[in-house]
Amino acid sequence: MNILTRSLLAASALALGAAVPVAAKTFVYCSEASPEGFDPAPYTAGTTFDASAHPVYNRLVEFKKGTTEVEPGLAESWEVSEDGLEYTFHLRKGVKWQSNDVFTPTRDFNADDVIFSYDRQGNKDNPWHEYIAGITYEYYTAMEMPSLIKSVEKVDDNTVKFVLNRPEAPFMANIAMPVAS
């Protein structure tokens, strides 16, 4: 056997060994760069959104794959008031939090979680607003969410209402963005 044939056989054997399936509980993610973090809200890099917002988090509404059409996410339905100032979302029931060795969820996802998610970005007094020193919420601020959202209110455990200061045509698209995770 010549050297070229041996090299090809060795390379083939290595390639076959690499094709062995990874254990079922192992998550393998390849990216062109390192994400800034795994919380998409305070960051702006596509690598962060690709590594966290899309595979890990859900939003009230999401974009239908390959489009800018909004479809249900954590909210199964919603109503918009005639004046465009109130958006009422009806949350899916039975949504479970992920669990792992250090976190065991004690309840299902509910309206309080939606309120927390938006409050931590828009309310500087929220203890989780700057849980990493110096972080900002550039997309949230650029979409003028702090001045747009008057309040996020719990109607009941599975219903949340956003009250806006003014009508905002792209509001539904804005909350489908990765930063709204």
Show the residue positions of the predicted features.
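N-terminal lobe/hinge region of extracytoplasmic solute-binding protein
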Residues: 30-82, 119, 126
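Extracytoplasmic/secreted proteins, especially bacterial periplasmic and envelope-associated proteins
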Residues: 55, 65, 69, 73, ...
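Solvent-exposed coil/turn segments that connect beta secondary-structure elements
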Residues: 32-35, 43, 65-66, 83-85, ...
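Bacterial N-terminal signal peptides
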Residues: 10-17
